[in-house]
Design a protein with these regions (language model features):
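Active-site-adjacent structural elements in enzyme catalytic domains
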Residues: 1-16, 20
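Second-shell residues forming the walls of enzyme active-site clefts
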Residues: 43-203, 210-213
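Short coil-to-beta-strand
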Residues: 16-27, 104-105
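Flexible, glycine/charged-enriched surface loops at secondary-structure junctions
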Residues: 199-205, 220-223
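Short, conserved phosphate-binding/catalytic loop or strand-edge motifs used
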Residues: 27-35
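Short alpha-helical functional segments enriched in proximate histidine and acidic residues
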Residues: 11, 15, 58, 214
Length: 224
């Protein structure tokens, strides 16, 4: 794993690319989410965790930020929903994420699936303050960059306008909004929300701090 991800990071860095949307930290059984088959490190969180860590460390040692996919875990998703409770997730899907957090993962992508047993409603996790701020940042103690899954995905666009989705993601605690269906509308929605006081400038600064902290770390490593 270290050798493979080291080779990937070296190639990316040679082209000036400083972030990789990998590794996939989900765990999935043979009967689980078919879209993840062959992309994960297995069906057991305790076994997969050191492999995820090896991938993260190998990327980041070469100044390429790892982005762990896809919190809270899509391995057992049915009809766009995770049916496990918080305690069940802590003992299974969260093991890889928790371990990588403790080992300094730069960024975590939050999924567009919902987790009603954890959040109490069907809000997509990428737009849920309960999932991002309370669980990921609070329970798991993560203070790195949070990236949403693609906001142009039908799970989002079927229920939210581009502007509303962008605002909801930032209010929930996300730092990077990935691929809204219409960037201009998403951007204007954020500007309008700041003007209205729905999003404070301090909230934007929090995200900028997390992003620049990683950029500065990588730049400093390159200088050294």
């Amino acid at each position: 794993v270290r050798e493979a991800y080291g080779a990937i990071a070296t190639k990316l860095a040679a082209f000036g690319i400083n972030m990789d949307l990998a590794p996939v930290a989900d765990i999935v059984s043979e009967q689980g989410n078919s879209s993840l088959q062959g992309r994960t490190f297995g069906s057991d969180g305790a076994t997969a965790a050191p492999l995820v860590n090896a991938a993260v460390q190998s990327l980041q040692e070469r100044e390429v930020s790892a982005v762990l996919l896809t919190f809270p875990g899509e391995g057992a998703v049915t009809d766009g929903k995770v049916s496990k409770s918080l305690e069940e997730m802590k003992n299974s899907d969260f093991l890889t994420f928790q371990s990588a957090i403790q080992n300094g993962a730069d960024c975590i992508m939050v999924s567009n699936v919902s987790a009603p047993e954890i959040t109490g409603d069907d809000t997509p996790c990428s737009l849920s303050g309960t999932m991002i701020t309370d669980v990921l940042r609070g329970t798991l103690g993560y203070n790195g960059i949070v990236m949403t899954d693609m906001l142009g995905d039908s799970a989002i666009t079927a229920r939210y306008s581009d502007g509303d989705a962008a605002v909801a993601a930032i209010v929930a605690g996300a730092d990077i909004l990935l691929c809204p269906a219409d960037f201009s509308k998403a951007y204007q929605g954020v500007l309008d929300a700041v003007s209205a006081g729905t999003i404070t400038e301090e909230r934007i600064q929090e995200s900028l701090y997390r992003i620049y902290r990683v950029k500065y770390k990588n730049t400093l490593n390159n200088v050294q």
